[in-house]
Amino acid sequence: MKKIYLILFYILTSLTINAQINTIYSKSYGQSENPAIIFIHGGPRGNSTLFEGTTAEKLAEKGYYVIVYDRRGEGRSIDTTATFTFQEAIKDLNSLYQKYNIKRANIIAHSFGGLVGTLFTEQNPQKVNSLILTGALFSQQETYDHILETTKKNYLEQKDNLMLSKIAEIERLPKNSAEYRQQCYEVASKNNYFKMPFPTKEANQLREDYEKSEFGKNNIRNDNAPTLFYQNETQNNIDTKPVLKNLKKQVKLFAIYGQQDQIFSQKQLNDMKRIVKKKNFKIIDNCSHYPFVDQQTEFINTIEKWIK
């Protein structure tokens, strides 16, 4: 009888582990023998559908093995038990390496994914050939301060007292709270900080095709993710510049940002350029927070040049 219980316990444990693994949505593009690229999306609350639907296959056609995935509890990786911590994300990323039998990869880390990619690389430098920060967060409080300072200036010029009061309210919120982060980004969005100034025909077509595609229809957003992240993760408002300075001794570091990505100050961009060095830093004009859509051709050409 004891033996039967042990067998049942083993089966149930195996099923639980497999269920947890299967909650992670991932997909590969291209030939597995080609240099690997893993894309880490933004968030918390995001997904990789925009990159997957517009750029993943095109990069694969250039001779790369491109892997996209949605973090646990975000997008298509539905998991009600997700904690949304960095360590959980790092553990799942390690599992992705095992699933696709990858020893080393080039990581494209976008927005909040820049923090995940940086912390993963810090813990696993032997698994990373290059870390490509793409519109990536790296000094969160500086970003929040910049958003509030510049939008306040805009509203002062417009004499918009209602929004000036709103900014003052945001400034009084706890800096390590989901509400503070959310309201900073909401006011940035209201001021078009995430939009390219002069959309090109190519960029418009990419977005239109994406919206009509299965990827656009699966643009799932977990509105609880930011709250749970701030509840469970102590490192919820960090500056990774010191980490990046150490990392460049171990892995190749690159950074690509939109000239009109207005959530970053000029000081922040200069700081990043100093860390990765000028030859590994790219600013794209008429481009905001999504370089792989706003200026896709230049984005792909830059990636090719860096990791050829």
Where are each of the predicted segments found?
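Flexible "cap/lid" loop of the alpha/beta hydrolase fold
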Residues: 133-176
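Conserved hydrolase catalytic core segment
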Residues: 104-146
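Conserved alpha/beta-hydrolase
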Residues: 60-76
